């Protein structure tokens, strides 16, 4: 039996921490880190110009939806800081969603609007939403880095309070006057 997969391309700071968390998310089949969103061909760690460090995620849409993947993405990095995650600063560490089709674009924009309206995050989302372009796979030493170096650097963690209420819950919250 062949599993149907979808592809997501996300950037949220250093790709090591993003990959370590996303690879374990239910429905994720494979991940690889690389560079995208810039103008340098054949990007490498030493020469990636204005590309973002990104992660390509292949997932089973019968197990997890693109929306669920994005909600988790927004929990594991700070989408309210421009060109920065933790101590890492610069365009390489920007928050971005690189959509592969118009449906992904719509879902990304809708999710960002709901996050901004929720008031749960410390500021407004600055995540770029851009069409996916070439993805340059990072060098082998960057793939699954935190699997090989468990105490290696990361600034990514799950923020339990940064979770959007389910849509039906959101209506109940508004009706209950909690917001």
From Swiss-Prot:
> Which residues are annotated as active site?
14
Q: What is its EC number?
A: 1.8.4.11
Q: Which domain of life is it from?
A: Bacteria
- Spans traversing the lipid bilayer: none
Asked if the record carries the keyword Methyltransferase, the reply is no
Catalytic activity reads: L-methionyl-[protein] + [thioredoxin]-disulfide + H2O = L-methionyl-(S)-S-oxide-[protein] + [thioredoxin]-dithiol; [thioredoxin]-disulfide + L-methionine + H2O = L-methionine (S)-S-oxide + [thioredoxin]-dithiol
Tell me the enzyme class. Answer: oxidoreductase
- Cross-referenced InterPro entries: Met_Sox_Rdtase_MsrA_dom, Met_Sox_Rdtase_MsrA_sf
One MF term in the entry's GO annotations:
L-methionine:thioredoxin-disulfide S-oxidoreductase activity
Keyword flag Oxidoreductase: yes
Among the Pfam families in the record, one is: PMSR
One BP term from GO? protein modification process
Instruction: State the UniProt keywords alphabetically.
Output: Oxidoreductase
HAMAP family xref list: MsrA
NCBIfam families from the xrefs? Answer: msrA
- Family designation: Belongs to the MsrA Met sulfoxide reductase family.
Q: What does this protein do?
A: Has an important function as a repair enzyme for proteins that have been inactivated by oxidation. Catalyzes the reversible oxidation-reduction of methionine sulfoxide in proteins to methionine.
Q: What is the protein name stated in its UniProt record?
A: Peptide methionine sulfoxide reductase MsrA
């Amino acid at each position: 039996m062949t599993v149907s997969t979808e592809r997501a391309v996300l950037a949220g700071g250093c790709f090591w921490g993003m990959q370590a968390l996303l690879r374990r998310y239910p429905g994720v089949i494979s991940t690889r880190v690389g560079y995208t969103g810039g103008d340098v061909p054949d990007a490498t760690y030493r020469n990636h110009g204005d590309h973002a460090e990104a992660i390509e995620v292949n997932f089973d849409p019968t197990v997890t939806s693109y929306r669920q993947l994005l909600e988790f993405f927004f929990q594991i990095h700070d989408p309210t800081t421009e060109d920065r995650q933790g101590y890492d600063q610069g365009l390489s560490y920007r928050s971005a969603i690189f959509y592969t089709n118009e449906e992904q674009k719509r879902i990304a924009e809708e999710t960002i609007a709901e996050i901004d309206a929720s008031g749960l995050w410390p500021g407004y989302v600055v995540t770029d939403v851009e069409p996916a372009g070439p993805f340059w796979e990072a060098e082998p030493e960057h793939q699954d880095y935190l699997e090989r170096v468990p105490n290696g650097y990361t600034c990514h963690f799950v923020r339990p309070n940064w979770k959007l209420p389910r849509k039906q819950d959101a209506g109940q919250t508004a009706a209950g006057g909690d917001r």
